[in-house]
Structure formats: C-alpha cells, structure tokens
A protein has these predicted regions:
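Generic hydrophobic/aromatic pocket-lining and core-packing "Φ" positions
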Residues: 66, 167, 183-186
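Alpha-helix C-terminal capping segments
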Residues: 68-73, 89, 173, 187-195
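His/Asp/Glu-rich mid-to-C-terminal helical/loop segments that flank catalytic regions of hydrolases
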Residues: 206-256
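Zn-dependent metallopeptidase/amidohydrolase metal-coordination segment
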Residues: 180-218
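Metabolite-binding pocket within alpha/beta catalytic cores that recognizes anionic/polar moieties
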Residues: 1-125
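Generic secondary-structure signature for well-ordered alpha-helical cores
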Residues: 74, 100-103, 137-146, 159, ...
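Active-site rim beta-loop-alpha module in soluble metabolic enzymes
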Residues: 127-172
Length: 256
C-alpha cells in the first residue's frame, strides 16, 4: 500500500464506498485508518480530526497518524487542510498546492526522535515532495486560476482564529494561506522518510481582510461545497503517480 490520504476539516471520508477500518497501535499511541480503493490503488485514509471532528488542532496525535501509515507500508501521503486566504489573488473556493510553510505553533510534539538518544536534523529546504506536488498540478490541468501551483502555508496553534494584527504580520512575511494543522505533520512525514504533499482548500478570507467574521461552521459549510473537486483531484493525482517507481529523496531523509 503506497498511498495514504489525511483528510482535513470536512473530508471525513473519501469515496462513499464501504471500507475496512483498522485501529493501529504505534509507539506514540493509536490511530484509526480506513482502507479503500482509489484510482485502482489500495489507499489508507485517516480523518485528521477524527470522523466526528472531535479533535482540536493541538489535540491531534500527528505522530501516531504518520507512524500508523508508515506501519501500513505507505510511502506517499496526500494531505488536505482548510485554510484562510492571506493573498488577494487566492479566492475562497480555490485550491493551493503548498510549497513552503511558516510555523507559528507553540507546544506540539514536533519530532519522532525525541528520547531516542541521537541527533536527527532533517533538511526542510523543500518541505513538500516535488514529485507529489507535480502529480497534483498535472492532475489539476484545466482548473486554471482555481488551482495555485505554489503557496506558503502559515500554521498557527489554534484553536482560536487569528487576530487582524497577526494576519497583517503573516501577509508581510509572505504567507499565502493560514491554517492550524499543517505543522508538525509535514515535518514528521519527512522524518519518517515519506513523501508528503499538502493541498489547501481555501474556505474564507483570513480575519481582518474582509468585513465578514470567521466561524467554524462557515468553514465546514464552505469546505463541503468543494469536497467533490478535492476528491477528484486526489484520485487523478494517484492515477498519475502510480506508474512512477523511482525512489524519491524524501524517502532517504532521516535515520529512522
């Protein structure tokens, strides 16, 4: 099983088909994954916030999720996340294939190597797998301006939304979208020698950019309207990448 999908807010299942559910025990705790067929490929799916959206961003066991996928043999992870736009050119309803991130989280479990008695410092110059990003971009050919080929994701601690002053700072730093779950997930994938790509579904303008107030209910509603587009893009990306057999440098990043 080469592919895993981690679904963000609104994406609690991927195909509507009946799927086998597995509970996996890892050294970092347990996680629950569904096994399904996508583009003819056996694929693992994890709902990041749990199927009932009971987990806040800082409560998610990112390490267990990634190591659970690793135990299942997953080498390539496609992860979705809702986000607010910081960039006037990125509209609600658009998708962004993430290329960089800025980390403003505060107290999460950031590494798989804690307590292992050895130093491990992975290179994050290009944090998202170039091969998987290319698969997403080629799969999205024809979407036009609604699919952005690059974007810097700002990750905040949450669960509160950002202040207008924070949003102004993130914009000045070059952030394009802002969310609460992309870090440390992307870092842990690199430590686990897994390819990882992030796809941001933009559901709203970040606070202070428009006059409208942000609410979780509005984010969920906006995400639900775009889920079929996200599902189709993920399936087409897997279809494009399934024939690729060469090992990626992502899979040789850390001494795990």
């Amino acid at each position: 099983m080469r592919y895993g999908i981690i679904g963000g807010t609104g994406l609690y299942e991927i195909t509507g088909q009946r799927a086998q559910t597995m509970r996996l025990e890892t050294e970092f705790g347990s996680c629950t994954a569904m096994i399904l067929k996508l583009a003819g490929e056996e694929t693992a799916f994890i709902a990041r916030h749990a199927p009932d959206h009971s987990l806040l961003p800082h409560e998610i066991n990112y390490r267990a999720n990634l190591m659970g996928l690793k135990q299942m043999g997953v080498e390539r992870v496609l992860a979705t996340a809702t986000a607010g736009s910081l960039n006037d050119r990125i509209q609600p309803g658009d998708l962004v294939v993430l290329s960089q991130f800025l980390d403003f989280t505060k107290g999460r479990a950031y590494t798989l190597f804690e307590g292992k008695g050895r130093a491990a410092h992975v290179d994050m110059t290009e944090p998202y797998c170039l091969h998987l990003r290319d698969d997403l971009l080629k799969a999205g050919t024809g979407m036009g301006e609604a699919l952005h080929p690059v974007g810097t994701y700002v990750c905040t601690e949450g669960p509160r939304f950002e202040t207008a002053a924070e949003v102004a700072m993130f914009r000045a730093l070059g952030g394009d979208v802002v969310g609460m779950t992309g870090v440390p997930e992307v870092v842990l994938a690199r430590e686990a020698n897994m390819c990882y790509a992030g796809l941001a579904l933009v559901t709203n303008w970040a606070p202070g950019i428009s006059q409208e107030r942000v609410s979780h209910e509005e984010v969920v509603r906006a995400a639900s309207q775009e889920l079929e587009k996200v599902r189709r893009l993920l399936e087409m990306a897997i279809q494009r990448g399934r024939e690729r057999s060469e090992r990626c440098s992502c899979q040789q990043s850390a001494p795990i």
